[in-house]
């Protein structure tokens, strides 16, 4: 009996001390949580009681060199619903169908969905948003948002690019400089009860958004308009497939205008242009959207034809294998190995100097010059002049040069390369390389971006683009400027001549592949003033109907552009 009492007493003591120990542990844990983890759990509790809604930040503007706004923002609204706050679901559904023009089935599905916040429609105009707000229905949210707006719509569309539904850049400058243009979104924090219903008489917490920075570019809206008007005119009159125009400063590579016509509508970037309307709603719609957005100035390559003779001549002068006084003879063709390669003048130019050979754009002269340089050295000049590398322009999707391997260049390949066939480069590559030859021999990097500015026009960042000095001698550059001025004043580029101005330039007519298609590219590359170039213009007309010679149809387009931009840039006669 005594043993049982002792046993029970011991059992009670163990239970008592266990309870005391557990209580002490729990109290200690509670004290620890209150003193050291209190803030954390307070925040967690608040998060359970708060609903977040984003406040979209305004995207930075894109400006031309003079501050003209090329891309900005338009205030719009995003309409959302919170299911467990809606008190009159049928009325809400009817109102949203009426105001937003969305099918009832789609609206009902979203209104009846059990989620904390369900978006109904974005990019709703402010007027409609205000009407929806005026209904005063519980559970319907109208939040401020921004939609990208392009004041000039089609102007420089393939350079500027556009943004997607999330307001992030997709192509063009919008994509390349997205990290500078995008802002930081703000937040609206709303207190809710356990059911997720907003608590009355408790204000919202707001974290204001921060707008993106502005991008100032080298584009000039007026020059872009001049170039676009000229491209449009040539496109219609020549019934061409497309027209590309590049206007740049050859001394630093700043692009003042870039047109690839037809352009697309920046404010409706997924709406096919008239030429592609037949593909709307078909399986090929996306393919033709991609074609419409493609910038052939940088994304595509082509055989440059006779404009490349500028580079062949510069390489020959650098190599010392030709002088301005050298004499040649053109019977209308030249035989290289077993290949008879004709001149565009099939009856021949007869006896001519090197200067006259350039004025006449004589193929046999340039084949002779190319053979003098030799395949190995010519390939070295491709490397020296930068032709084997991308230009590095600050636009996406630049294509690479398509060139024979050094060891695969025989005499026939060398002959055709010397007058701009059997290899391909981009238009921007041609414009950049010729700029570098005529500017004294400095290989520039073509670019559009200049600097990033905040809303107060304070410069945040200036972009520097590399320059490679000495790709050719100043003496070579001077001779090339002289030779190309003669092409316009006395040679095949005379249709680009403007009284009172010294303009240098070179014509080209090249055939596309396959040759059997008989499609041609007419082009003209010019610069002014010839003795101290401040502006270079490249015009490319693809597959024009009727006459297709560059000197006949591309040179007048070049002249029209120069007649507008030379006085505008105040370049003296």
What do these predicted regions represent?
Residues 1-275, 301, 323, 376-388, ...:
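Periplasmic/cell-envelope proteins involved in peptidoglycan metabolism and beta-lactam response
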Residues 71, 193-204, 251-307, 311-543, ...:
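Beta-lactam-recognizing serine transpeptidase/beta-lactamase-like catalytic domain environment
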């Amino acid at each position: 009996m005594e043993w049982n009492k002792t046993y029970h007493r011991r059992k009670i003591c163990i239970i008592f001390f266990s309870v005391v120990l557990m209580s002490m542990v729990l109290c200690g844990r509670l004290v620890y949580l209150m003193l050291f983890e209190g803030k954390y759990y307070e925040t967690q509790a608040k998060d359970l009681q708060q609903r977040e809604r984003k406040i979209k930040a305004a995207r930075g503007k894109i400006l031309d060199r003079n501050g003209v706004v090329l891309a900005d923002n338009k205030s719009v609204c995003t309409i959302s619903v919170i299911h467990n706050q809606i008190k009159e679901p049928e009325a809400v559904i009817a109102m949203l169908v009426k105001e937003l023009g969305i099918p009832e089935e789609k609206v009902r599905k979203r209104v009846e969905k059990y989620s904390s916040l369900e978006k109904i429609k974005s990019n709703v105009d402010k007027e409609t948003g205000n009407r929806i707000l005026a209904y005063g229905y519980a559970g319907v949210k109208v939040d401020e948002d921004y939609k990208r707006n392009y004041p000039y719509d089609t102007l420089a569309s393939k350079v500027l690019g556009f943004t997607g539904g999330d307001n992030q850049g997709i192509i063009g400058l919008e994509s390349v400089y997205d990290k500078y243009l995008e802002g930081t979104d703000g937040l609206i924090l709303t207190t809710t009860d356990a059911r997720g219903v907003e608590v009355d008489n408790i204000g919202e917490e707001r974290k204001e958004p921060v707008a993106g920075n502005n991008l100032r570019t080298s584009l000039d809206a007026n020059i872009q308009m001049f170039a676009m008007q000229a491209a449009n005119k040539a496109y219609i009159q020549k019934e061409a497939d497309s027209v590309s125009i590049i206007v740049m400063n050859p001394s630093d590579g700043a692009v003042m205008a870039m047109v690839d016509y037809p352009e697309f509508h920046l404010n409706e970037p997924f709406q096919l242009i008239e030429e592609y309307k037949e593909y709307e709603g078909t399986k090929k719609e996306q393919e033709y959207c991609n074609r419409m957005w493609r910038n052939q100035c940088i994304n595509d390559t082509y055989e440059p034809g006779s404009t490349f003779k500028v580079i062949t001549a510069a390489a020959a002068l650098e190599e010392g294998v030709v002088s301005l006084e050298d004499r040649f003879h053109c019977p209308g063709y030249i035989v290289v190995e077993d290949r008879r390669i004709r001149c565009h003048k099939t009856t021949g130019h007869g006896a001519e100097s090197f200067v006259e050979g350039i004025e006449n754009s004589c193929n046999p002269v340039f084949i002779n010059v190319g053979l003098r340089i030799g395949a190995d050295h010519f390939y070295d000049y491709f490397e020296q002049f930068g032709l084997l590398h991308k230009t590095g322009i600050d636009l996406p999707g630049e294509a690479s040069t398509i060139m024979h391997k050094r060891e695969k260049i025989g005499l026939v390949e060398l002959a055709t390369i010397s007058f701009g066939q059997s290899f391909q480069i981009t238009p921007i590559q041609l414009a950049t390389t010729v700029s570098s030859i005529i500017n004294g021999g400095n290989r520039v990097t073509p670019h559009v971006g200049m600097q990033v500015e905040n809303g107060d026009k304070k410069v945040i960042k200036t972009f520097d683009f590399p320059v490679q000095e000495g790709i050719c001698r100043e003496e070579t550059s001077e001779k090339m400027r002289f030779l190309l001025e003669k092409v316009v004043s006395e040679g095949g580029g005379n249709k680009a001549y403007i009284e009172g101005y010294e303009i240098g330039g070179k014509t080209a007519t090249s055939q596309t592949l396959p040759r059997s298609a008989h499609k041609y590219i007419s082009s003209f590359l010019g610069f002014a003033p010839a003795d101290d170039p401040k502006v270079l213009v490249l015009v490319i007309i693809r597959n024009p109907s009727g006459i297709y010679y560059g000197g006949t149809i591309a040179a007048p387009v070049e002249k029209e552009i120069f007649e507008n931009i030379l006085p505008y840039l105040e370049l003296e006669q």
